[in-house]
Amino acid sequence: MPKGSGKVIAQNKKAFHDYFIEETYEAGLVLQGTEIKSIRAGRVNLKDAFARVHNGEVWVHNMHISTYEQGNRFNHDPLRTRKLLLHKKEIDKLAGAAKETGYALVPLKIYLKNGFAKMALGLAKGKKQYDKRHDLKEKEAKREIARAFRDRQKM
């Protein structure tokens, strides 16, 4: 995430488990009035979200932003597709990379920067099952080393 970034609202931890993140991009979100209020309240879920390039625009699908409690008939649809704001060069680069086999555009986190909602979008390659097992083994080994080091420091 770039320097001067603000408060992180939501993270997609599952993305780091299921994908190798090769590049990250910062994208603005086109939102309705009640959506930004729900995001500021922290009521957003990125678990099943993904992004696609369509007609030279990037759209995020399945991102759940809960309805705003005080919003009446003007409330938004929680699962509507939302447009992401990126530079044209970035969109062209993402479109070319996403067409390759095994690559996907995955939302990594939503944060507020200077009052605006931003999304960290990752160009990701899917992990195989053995890659996930290997990562879990490495993580467990690091925990064991840290635990042994802590126990040794106590003595």
From Swiss-Prot:
Entries under InterPro entries matching the protein: SmpB, SsrA-bd_prot, SsrA-bd_prot_CS
GO molecular function, one term: RNA binding
SUPFAM superfamilies with a match to the protein in the record: Small protein B (SmpB) (SSF74982)
Entry's localization field: Cytoplasm
Cleavable signal peptide: none
Any single GO BP term: trans-translation
A Pfam family per the record: SmpB
Alphabetically ordered keywords of this record: Cytoplasm, RNA-binding
GO cellular component, one term: cytosol
Function: Required for rescue of stalled ribosomes mediated by trans-translation. Binds to transfer-messenger RNA (tmRNA), required for stable association of tmRNA with ribosomes. tmRNA and SmpB together mimic tRNA shape, replacing the anticodon stem-loop with SmpB. tmRNA is encoded by the ssrA gene; the 2 termini fold to resemble tRNA(Ala) and it encodes a 'tag peptide', a short internal open reading frame. During trans-translation Ala-aminoacylated tmRNA acts like a tRNA, entering the A-site of stalled ribosomes, displacing the stalled mRNA.
Family: Belongs to the SmpB family.
PANTHER family: SSRA-BINDING PROTEIN, TMRNA-BINDING COMPONENT OF TRANS-TRANSLATION TAGGING COMPLEX
Annotated protein name in UniProt: SsrA-binding protein
Lineage: Bacteria, Bacillati, Bacillota, Bacilli, Bacillales
